[in-house]
A protein has these predicted regions:
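Short amphipathic alpha-helices and their capping/turn residues within compact interaction modules
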Residues: 18, 22, 36, 40, ...
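Conserved hydrophobic beta-strand positions in leucine-rich repeat
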Residues: 64-67, 100-108, 155, 178-188, ...
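Charged, low-complexity intrinsically disordered regulatory segments in eukaryotic signaling
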Residues: 1-6, 333-342
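Cullin-RING E3 adaptor/co-adaptor recruitment helices
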Residues: 1-218, 243, 386, 417, ...
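A structural signal for leucine-rich repeat
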Residues: 197-202, 222-231, 248-267, 285-295, ...
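Helix-rich alpha-solenoid scaffolding regions
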Residues: 53-92, 228, 234-236, 244-275, ...
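Short, solvent-exposed loop/turn at the beta-strand->alpha-helix junction
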Residues: 19-23, 33, 48, 113-115, ...
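Extended amphipathic alpha-helical scaffolding regions
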Residues: 153-157, 168-173, 182-187, 192-200, ...
Length: 463
């Protein structure tokens, strides 16, 4: 036997309204504000398109968070078309009733709680999504001047064709410059031509996060750069796998790099920068760093080749002096003087919270130079030193230094190389001895801490 919850008075009222769509539409002007979210949700669920189209035109909140109800997939295409038809009617009006409040149609997968609220004050929280530079007001008693409306969406470009809903939306916004805003953009395709067409439709001022995760040539990146420079609200930029064609002159290479790096002058809100597997970075990092206009909170340079001069330029960059997160994993430092990295750690010691040096191939002699600087990072909470060859002796010294860091809660290391035999065989007895020794080292600590050891040998190092 199954039991179903008894419908509330609210749900009964909503269902009663939807039994006659024409009657429901005629009564929208007198409908209490609190009934709009549940009525819209019910009409959406049961595809009462006449009601949906009419409700869009008299929506009593600044934001209609449609993305909290639907995904931008083909199965919702008809519903999206109806909603946009209603928006069309609004856009064609020269003046609106004073009750008109809609400023944002949000198609992002957010605000799912909105549709479960009843109180008007909670529902009005959607207005936080409104980001307007200017307001036009008219104190007339019955009408207000036409104001701008924004449609927000998160974009993801993949090698396959765009989803039906996205394609329809892009057709709908053609000729309506500045109507479509995007805060998160992900690019997973090398075909820039189609991306540019969409970028030219977007109001790029609203862009906050961009992720480029495909194999672009340096020339492709340079062509994308002017659009990036228009993203003046950009806070997070992730770039991976940019390669350089073999037949390219140093002059041409420098010109393309400058086309990209010069755009950072415009990014006054940039806080997170991630560069992964960027082949042009070695010896060129200073070109980018000197274009940073604001302090970064997070810097990730991973699986890249860097020179000693690149590390020195990091220590001299004002934009990294307030770093909270530093990730250099996969940057091989074996043959590089550790002094620049030591200075870098000292520079960010007052703010650094996470440090990732996984697979940097740092050897004991280099680590010894870094220890005093590492122990001065008073805000450090996480330290990743996996896949670096380390001896028992230097590990014990390292733990003595990190023991001074009261906020450190997680440390990750590879098992010292002495634990392995000549052929890389793992010796459990040696590991148990090491555990006992390290436990004695950690006993004086006055706070909880996790020290994690990997027993997987590092193939490149042989440990």
């Amino acid at each position: 036997m199954s039991f179903q919850a008894t419908p509330t008075l609210l749900h009964l009222a909503v269902r009663s309204l939807l039994r006659n769509e024409a009657l429901a539409v005629s009564g929208l002007q007198d409908l209490p504000v609190e009934l709009f979210p549940p009525l819209f949700k019910e009409a959406f669920t049961h595809k009462r398109f006449m009601v949906l189209k009419a409700m869009v035109q008299v929506w009593p909140f600044p934001c209609l968070p449609l993305g909290g109800l639907m995904k931008m997939k083909a199965s919702y295409l008809e519903t999206l078309q109806i909603i946009l038809d209603g928006i069309n009617i609004l856009l064609d009006q020269k003046v609106h009733p004073r009750s008109y409040k809609l400023r944002v149609l949000d198609l992002r997968a957010l605000h799912k709680d909105f549709w479960n609220v009843w109180a008007g004050d909670q529902a009005a929280a959607g207005s936080l999504e409104v980001k307007r530079k200017k307001k036009t007001q008219n104190r007339g008693p019955r009408i207000v001047a036409k104001q701008s409306l924004k449609v927000f969406i998160d974009m993801c470009f993949k090698p396959r064709a765009l989803d039906a809903c996205i394609s329809y939306l892009l057709l709908w916004v053609e000729g309506r410059k500045g109507l479509l805003g995007c805060k998160k953009l992900k690019i997973s395709t090398i075909a820039l031509r189609n991306i540019v067409k969409v970028l030219e439709m977007l109001d790029l001022d609203y862009m906050e996060e961009v992720e480029v995760c495909c194999t672009w040539k340096l020339s492709t990146l340079a062509s994308f750069a002017p659009y990036m420079g228009q993203m003046r609200s950009l806070r997070k930029f992730l770039l991976s796998h940019v390669c350089i064609p073999v037949p390219i002159s140093l002059e041409e290479k420098g010109k393309l790099i400058d086309q990209f790096t010069s755009q950072f002058h415009n990014l006054e809100y940039l806080r997170e920068l991630s560069l992964d597997s960027i082949s042009f970075l070695e010896g060129q990092l200073d070109r980018l760093l000197r274009c940073l206009t604001v302090p970064l909170e997070s810097l990730s340079i991973t699986d890249c080749e860097l020179s000693e001069s690149d590390l020195k330029s990091l220590t001299q960059c004002p934009g990294i002096r307030q770093l909270k997160h530093l990730d250099l994993s996969g940057v091989v430092l074996t043959n590089i003087n550790p002094e620049p990295l030591r200075i870098l750690l000292e520079t960010v010691a007052a703010t650094l919270k996470t440090l990732d040096l996984e697979n940097c191939r740092i050897v004991d002699s280099q680590l010894s130079v870094l220890l005093p600087a590492l122990s001065s990072c008073s805000q450090l909470t996480t330290f990743n030193y996996l896949r670096n060859p380390i001896s028992v002796a230097i590990l014990e010294r390292l733990l003595c230094h990190t023991a001074r860091l009261s906020r450190l809660t997680l440390e990750m290391y590879s098992t010292p190389w002495e634990i392995y035999g000549a052929q890389g065989a793992f010796h459990h007895k040696r590991l148990e001895q090491l555990r006992e020794e390290l436990s004695r080292t950690m006993e004086p600590l006055k706070h909880t801490r996790t020290v994690w050891f990997s027993i997987i040998p590092c193939p490149p190092c042989g440990y």
